[in-house]
């Protein structure tokens, strides 16, 4: 466990930090409530569509008034709503646990945890070979508008 988490006391936290955590908690609980409501809706719509035959009817064939298109549309819509609500609950719960407010901060935290900052510094300090430097300079000249296509004499092939 990091020293930050061991020495952290909520009484010493700033009001901005407390408000941020409260917002994260409310987002998670809202997503959880939506997940519960959509799962209840899915359960009830499934029970309502259930075919219950009468005493001497076969249970292997649906009634003639059955509409497969409507049933498929309701199933797809219900599944999509359930998938979206559960996914949002998982993402917002993970953000609350990791104390992350947006995707940019999540990317920065993951880069820090996986050692990306040190690797990026190491790559930045490495010497660039001549071909890479030529390509980089050519692209920079092209983006800056310094490259003149007519000077080449119509020869656009790469050497």
UniProtKB/Swiss-Prot annotation:
It is found in: Membrane. One of its GO terms (cellular component) is mitochondrion. Keywords: Membrane, Transmembrane, Transmembrane helix. InterPro entries: AIM11. The chain crosses the membrane at residues 25-43, 74-98. It is a multi-pass membrane protein. Signal peptide: none annotated. It comes from the Eukaryota. Belongs to the AIM11 family. This is Altered inheritance of mitochondria protein 11. It comes from Candida tropicalis (strain ATCC MYA-3404 / T1) (Yeast). The gene is AIM11.
